[in-house]
Amino acid sequence: VVLGPASDGRNAAANVKAPDLIALTVRNDCCHNAPCRNNHPGICG
């Protein structure tokens, strides 16, 4: 089986624009933090 270049995860971040990566990081950190998640329900789905 041959997988695409980003399928191993090493290059996945390189394919994301920096602001998107920052937003994703903030969202992940916030959504794992109950007070932040409760204060920002729109970003955690």
Curated annotation (Swiss-Prot):
Higher taxonomy: Eukaryota, Metazoa, Spiralia, Lophotrochozoa, Mollusca
Alphabetical list of Pfam families matching this protein: Toxin_8
Region of interest (Lacks the Ser-Xaa-Pro motif that is crucial for potent interaction with nAChR), residue spans: 32-34
Full protein name: Alpha-conotoxin-like Lp1.10
Subcellular location, record wording: Secreted
GO cellular component, one term: extracellular region
A molecular function (GO) term: ion channel regulator activity
Entry similarity comment: Belongs to the conotoxin A superfamily.
Protein purpose: Alpha-conotoxins act on postsynaptic membranes, they bind to the nicotinic acetylcholine receptors (nAChR) and thus inhibit them. Has possibly a distinct nAChR binding mode from other alpha-conotoxins, due to a different three residue motif (lacks the Ser-Xaa-Pro motif).
Propeptide intervals in chain numbering: 1-27
Cysteine amide PTM positions: 44
Tissue specificity note: Expressed by the venom duct.
Secreted keyword on record: yes
Cystine pairs: 30-36, 31-44
Domain topic, free-text comment: The cysteine framework is I (CC-C-C). Alpha4/7 pattern.
